[in-house]
């Protein structure tokens, strides 16, 4: 892993990449901790990218990996002389566990550094020389086996802490979950069946007669009419027998 403090390696790699694609072009690359996002001076252009980097807290020695390390570049060309200058700022991050700690400087692998500079050279060649984009290696093939979950930690990001310029441009925004769509209403009226009648027991002497509530009705048909209950039927039978005896005398 290499520190941005070893910037001579960055400058050398940048010059080599420029000479491969644009021989004779003279561009310089310098670190500048004063440039800010969306704050390029008149005539300068801005280029931003996020890459994979590793941090270590200088207070508690805790280390963490982030895929949201922001790299900012401001460029000024002199196309008549085929030369220009680029200024780069590498933003740090704070430890999530320590209160009031400083922004730590990230470390990068050699492959990541080359990718950062490839992206910068690509932008310069396309913007100022009309070159086609050079195919780059994806992050997945750089040999970095790390698990990266969760949104961008804006509270501990140096780029996001610049109040005059707001959050860094490449901070991930979490989309709110979509509410489920309401179920469609049916146009035809629903037919509800009447609740089944409750079971009732009625005692007459030593016999128990169960009400018709225990009968099962199919579908929504109306229940059958109730039959004459035994006490009324017995009374009518006695009255008919008495009248018959009266007329036969």
Swiss-Prot record:
Its main location: membrane. Pfam families: Zn_ribbon_3CxxC. The gene is Rtp4. One of its GO terms (cellular component) is membrane. It is found in: Membrane; Cytoplasm. It is a single-pass type III membrane protein. Residues 199-208 have a biased composition (Polar residues). InterPro entries: R-trans_p, ZAR1/RTP1-5-like_Znf-3CxxC. Interacts with TASR16. Interacts with OPRD1 and OPRM1; the interaction promotes cell surface localization of the OPDR1-OPRM1 heterodimer. This is Receptor-transporting protein 4. Chaperone protein that facilitates the trafficking and functional cell surface expression of some G-protein coupled receptors (GPCRs). Promotes functional expression of the bitter taste receptor TAS2R16. Also promotes functional expression of the opioid receptor heterodimer OPRD1-OPRM1. In addition, acts as a potent IFN-inducible suppressor of pathogens including lyssavirus rabies, influenza A or yellow fever virus. Mechanistically, associates with the viral replicase, binds viral RNA, and thereby suppresses viral genome amplification that replicates at the endoplasmic reticulum.
């Amino acid at each position: 892993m290499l520190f941005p403090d070893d910037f001579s390696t960055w400058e050398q790699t940048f010059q080599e990449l420029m000479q491969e694609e644009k021989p004779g072009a003279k561009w310089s690359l310098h670190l500048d901790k004063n440039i800010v996002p969306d704050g390029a001076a008149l005539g300068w252009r801005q280029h931003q990218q996020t890459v994979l980097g590793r941090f270590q807290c200088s207070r508690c020695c805790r280390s963490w990996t982030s895929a949201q390390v922001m790299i900012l570049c401001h460029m000024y060309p002199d196309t008549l002389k085929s030369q220009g200058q680029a200024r780069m700022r590498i933003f740090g991050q704070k430890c999530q566990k320590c209160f009031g700690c400083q922004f730590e400087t990230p470390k990068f692998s050699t492959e990541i550094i080359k990718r950062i500079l490839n992206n910068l050279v690509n932008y310069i060649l396309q913007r100022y020389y009309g070159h086609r984009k050079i195919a780059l290696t994806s992050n997945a093939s750089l040999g970095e086996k790390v698990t990266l979950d969760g949104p961008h930690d804006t509270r501990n990001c140096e780029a996001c802490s610049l109040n005059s310029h707001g959050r860094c441009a490449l901070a991930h925004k979490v989309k709110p979950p979509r509410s489920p769509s309401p179920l469609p209403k049916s146009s035809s009226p629903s037919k509800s069946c009447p609740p089944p009648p409750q079971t009732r027991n009625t005692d007459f002497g030593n016999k128990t007669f169960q009400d018709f509530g225990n009968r099962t009705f199919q579908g929504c048909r109306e229940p059958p009419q109730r039959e004459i209950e035994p006490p009324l039927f017995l009374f009518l039978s006695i009255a008919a027998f008495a009248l018959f005896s009266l007329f036969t005398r």
